[in-house]
Structures are given as structure tokens and as C-alpha cells.
Amino acid sequence: MQSGFNANGIVATPDGRYLLLVQTNTGALYRVDVANGETIQVDLGAGSLPGGDGLELEGQTLWVVREGQVTRVELSPDYASGTVGDSFTDPSFTDPTTLARFDDCLLVVNSQFSQQQGQPELPFTVSSVPIPGAGEAVGTPSATPLAAGSC
């Protein structure tokens, strides 16, 4: 086990058979079989997800909050391999940590890690951004504007 942040962000596959989690300090993605605990590293080819934190899974598409941005990963039907796709950010993001899908939007939680030595600014915020490139192949630039609050 390496020092630093390790397992983070956990989601279940739609059938409940597997859990996916990211190792924050290495960028590795893992698949855990719920029935027997067998764990494999998901083959992302040359891709990785350093700083991975929050995860959201919609079918075979995994959204990963990492290093101030959101990255799309397209996974194989057995969740054993995948392709790291495009990443995006938004001016409304402030140290984003996790996310959830709501309709055609991603709701991204903004942390206040930068306020650890003082009082947090209230209220805490959640950014609402359109899902970029919905229905497009990974790597295709999005025609959807990423204006905060437009969802």
C-alpha cells in the first residue's frame, strides 16, 4: 500500500455485481466482485486517473472527478477495461470532490479544502453543468456549452 490517499469514490454497476473504485494517489481504477471480493485493476491502456475522487456510473460511462476537472471513461460491458476520454472543467468549480447525475446534468460538489485553516465560506455550493457530448463518441468535442447553472 502506498502512502497518501488510496481507495476513493465508489460506485456499483447497474446489475450490482461489481463495485468500481479509484486509487487516488496512483490513478488506477479497480473492479471488485461483490460476491467473492476478487479485485482486478481495470485495464485503461495508457490512460490513468490520478487524483481521482468522486465517481458516477451511467451504463458503461464512468464520470471521474479529479484534479479540478471531470473526466469521462467508457468501460467495456464486463467493466474489466476502458478508455479514458475527454476531461472538462467549469469556472464554477472550486476544488470539486464528487458528483451525481440529474437528468442531463452533472451536479458537482465544490469542497472547501482551501479553507482548512479558517472558517468556510457559506453557503457551500454545488455546480450544475450539462453533460458534455451526450450521445457522442469519446474524444468528440462537445457542442454543449458548459455554462454553470444552465441545467
Residue ranges: model-predicted function:
Residues 12-14, 19-25, 62-68, 108-116:
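Conserved beta-strand positions in repeat-built beta-propeller and related beta-rich domains
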Residues 1-18, 45-65, 91-103:
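Beta-rich, blade/repeat-based domains predominating
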Residues 8-10, 25-51:
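Anionic-ligand binding region
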Residues 1-2, 38-45, 83-89:
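A short beta-strand motif characteristic of beta-propeller blades
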Residues 27-29, 70-72, 115-116, 126:
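Structural signal for beta-propeller blades
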Residues 138-151:
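Ser/Thr-rich, Proline-interspersed low-complexity disordered segments
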Residues 122-135:
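Beta-propeller blade signature
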Residues 33-38, 74-80, 130-132:
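Short loop/turn segments that connect beta-strands within beta-propeller blades
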